[in-house]
Amino acid sequence: MTRLALVAALATVLLLAGCTGTPVSSPEPSPSVPASSSSSPSPEAAPSTPAVVPAAPKRAACYRLSTPQLTKPTNASTPVSCGSRHTAQTIYVGTLDTVVDGHAVAVDSATVQRQLSTTCPSRLAAYVGGSTTARDLSRFNVVWYSPSLAQSDAGADWFRCDLIAFAGEDQLAPLPSTRKLRGALGRSGALADYGLCGTAAPGAQGFERVICSRGHSWRAIDTIGLAGGKRYPGTSQVRKAGDGDCRDLAQSRAGNTLKFRYGWEWPTRAQWGRGQRFGYCWIPG
């Protein structure tokens, strides 16, 4: 998931069968503050202080990150003991590739950002294990941090991938020990603790996405893939595309009775644009 996708995920508007959502506008950026100037020129320019090159982060370090920190490109938080409460753990530390065709590129260039947005999700998959579907149904996610431009200019070339889990829509869950976290989704019943659940029927009043270890009344039981290219097929098309499969799946989970409930959550246009080609099938429970 790209950092832009993560920002959007923190403000997702659900559009489910029989339900409509209200768009949430993004906050306007704060205006920049102009630097103060002096009418009298300085006789001598003060020597610039070179940026201190920080040591590379340590793999398996733990942090108490907050939600606003997740969308920042850099992070200078002090590690905490992994035996204490923490909301992030570094699962990989790598080296930035800042040379393209013999030319140096900036740490915030598209080339470097592509490296981070492909490397860290693959490292997350390897770390937590499980199938692609299990990971899509889980509340686990990954964020990445790199040096600041000044630190990069001074020689810092590392990046780190941090594993996180969402407890609610915009609240991080405390993470378990490293022993329990590594390979977590490869264990039986993992989604009962780390899966995607809801506090009400999806799209209904009072609905909030929560981690399944919290109180809930609905849960996502599967993802349903959708065919299509780059262009969004349209709401009516994606609504119909997975509804039948979700209905059949929910009925089978209900013992093939004629009376059952389900919710088909199809991807929005924005989610489709970010590469999501599946929706969620929900049932009470």
Stretches with model-predicted labels:
Residues M1-A9:
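Bacterial N-terminal signal peptides that target proteins for export
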Residues L10, T20-A45:
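Short, low-complexity, disordered segments immediately C-terminal to signal peptides
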Residues L15-G18:
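C-terminal motif of bacterial Sec signal peptides marking the signal peptidase cleavage site
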Residues V24, P41-G285:
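Long, compositionally biased stretches enriched for glycine and/or charged residues
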